Amino acid sequence: VAERIGGNGLTAWVALTKIARLQPGESVYISSAAGGVGSAAAQFAALLGAKRIVGSTRNAEKSRTLTDRLGYTDAFVYQSGKVSAQLRDIIPEGIDVYLDNVGGEQLEAAIAAFKDYGRAALIGAVAQYSALTPPSAPYNLFDVVGKSLTLQGFLVRDYKHLQEELEEFIIPHIQSGRVVPQDTVTYGFDHIVEAFLSMLKGGNIGKAIVSIE
């Protein structure tokens, strides 16, 4: 069971409990919501008592998966240039916590949606991994000051000592079926590049795995 949690699960755990310090009754927004970290984080957040768990993704099929299988209370298909408005429409009261797997416009939207004293865990920057030019910085960075926000990046390798803590918390929930690890498996080592590019384009649900068997 433990091996199915993996680095994505530990990343989600650290982001929620140590960096963003999610509290029961709070609302959380997760970008790249169907990916390895996002799919774990939503299920963890529900167990930790989050009131609203909002996720953004690339298409309607994935959006349905977020609410049907992964524990999200709300989901939307993001549209370039409209993410802030979309997020505001879904959760007009604002968010307390943001798990940022994307950067760029998604981070900008989260800053706009934050309540005072909101906390963001900066995990990745998918928006710039394959971009020809880096995305512009969020226009509203001064809101970090005005709302007393906390934005903190981290590397999961610095938190490996928390693996046992995570396993003690999550394994009973996996065994009971309340948490279901998500994988997208590509078979054949010769398809590794294809699998990687698919992951960058959001083609996976949960952890992207290449099996050489």
Language model regions located:
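C-terminal capping/lid region of NAD(P)-dependent oxidoreductase domains
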Residues: 176-185, 193-213
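Mid-domain Rossmann-like dinucleotide-binding core that forms the NAD(H)/NADP(H) cofactor-binding site
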Residues: 3-80
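Short amphipathic alpha-helix with an adjacent loop that forms part of the alpha/beta core around
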Residues: 82-93
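Short glycine-/small-residue-rich Rossmann-like dinucleotide-binding loops
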Residues: 34, 80, 102-103, 124
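Glycine-rich phosphate-binding loop and adjacent beta-alpha segment
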Residues: 50, 66-67, 105-179, 212-213
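Short SAM/SAH-binding signature in class I
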Residues: 93-100, 118-119
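Short acidic-hydrophobic, aromatic-tinged amphipathic segments that line or gate anion-handling sites
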Residues: 73-79, 184-191
